[in-house]
């Protein structure tokens, strides 16, 4: 019981800041009208729901969401889905756009995004500040990270995981540690990452999740703000500057529950986004969205149940090995191994396979679609074939990924744009 109380005290003394202003440029047109944290995932969620749910499930009830790029849909989603917290009980989820309080600039980097909100953080009087990436899909008990930080006497703790060197090159901050997990070296997105101890194929990559002692964080941010050559970034500037003279430790990422494999996905490319959604269709997926022990919270629209209509031999409405969300109608069509978000309509004689279909999409009659991502609000013309011939897809103006996933957006179809 004392350990439970200890963890509870730590989480109550923590303010979490989720950095949710990223564009996600490797997702191409999929993030033309929304920030990456606002991107849909898993049939009904948005990416921002995962770090927010981790906070709530970990007992952290004071959260700020830092926004910048194309933030309208993100702000609207957080206000609708996360506005039920009670300030009188010490709970809050606040939206923190760039205030330009200390300069006329927007957020210049991850460290600057925190620096511009120092006054708001100070008002909360936290003992610890947790800085979290808002654009990854994962389950993590932040209480364990906090406990490790407090017990080690660290000034800063960096959450990390092992990543193949080829995958990490140019994409992740990479660290070197000693046997006590003290960070000895840190490089931001090196082209030739240094391997983990005893494992030449893997390296220790930063997850972009940090815990700081509050006053230590403030001191380092103020120093960085005076450095004219700084990029105002934790990975590029803050961490390399402090590892020699201060206690900076790594915390290995682990599952929220014993004997379960830890789950973390970057979903930063079209292929990884498609693959992570497809993984959810497994009978026992690595990310179990149905696990009541660690629920993923989100904004719940009031929609009717999904409906499957017609049962003729050549016109049967059915979905197999798929996720089909509220408001969907499968009308005499077949859906296989696909994720359908809310209010999707698939009309008679059409076939949708191995695809991710975002909200409000209409697939008209006699279409054949496979290995595709259909962006929100697309209306697929009658008889259109997508995903069967990549040259034909490109000729229609669609984007084909490195691994053969076809992205279709409203703009590519000649429809008015602006869906978020």
Swiss-Prot record:
Q: List the disulfide bonds.
A: none
Could you tell me which InterPro entries the record lists for this protein? ADP-Glc_PPase, ADP_Glu_pyroP_CS, GlgC_bac, GlmU/GlgC-like_hexapep, NTP_transferase_dom, Nucleotide-diphossugar_trans, Trimer_LpxA-like_sf
For this UniProt entry, the molecular function terms from Gene Ontology, in alphabetical order, are: ATP binding; glucose-1-phosphate adenylyltransferase activity
The answer on whether this UniProt entry bears the keyword Nucleus reads no
Q: Which residues bind alpha-D-glucose 1-phosphate?
A: 107, 173, 188-189, 206
Arranged from A to Z, the UniProt key words for this protein are: ATP-binding, Carbohydrate metabolism, Glycogen biosynthesis, Glycogen metabolism, Nucleotide-binding, Nucleotidyltransferase, Transferase
Q: Which reaction does it catalyse?
A: alpha-D-glucose 1-phosphate + ATP + H(+) = ADP-alpha-D-glucose + diphosphate
Q: Name one Pfam family in it.
A: Hexapep_GlmU
PROSITE patterns listed in its UniProt record: ADP_GLC_PYROPHOSPH_1, ADP_GLC_PYROPHOSPH_2, ADP_GLC_PYROPHOSPH_3
**Superkingdom of the organism of origin:** Bacteria
> Which GO biological process entries does UniProt record here?
glycogen biosynthetic process
| EC id | 2.7.7.27
Report if keyword Lipid biosynthesis is assigned.
no
Q: What class of enzyme is it?
A: transferase
Its function? Involved in the biosynthesis of ADP-glucose, a building block required for the elongation reactions to produce glycogen. Catalyzes the reaction between ATP and alpha-D-glucose 1-phosphate (G1P) to produce pyrophosphate and ADP-Glc.
Family statement: Belongs to the bacterial/plant glucose-1-phosphate adenylyltransferase family.
User: What interactions and quaternary structure are annotated?
Assistant: Homotetramer.
* Name this protein carries in UniProt: Glucose-1-phosphate adenylyltransferase
Provenance organism: Shewanella baltica (strain OS185)
What phylogenetic lineage does the species belong to?
Answer: Bacteria, Pseudomonadati, Pseudomonadota, Gammaproteobacteria, Alteromonadales
Q: Which gene encodes it?
A: glgC
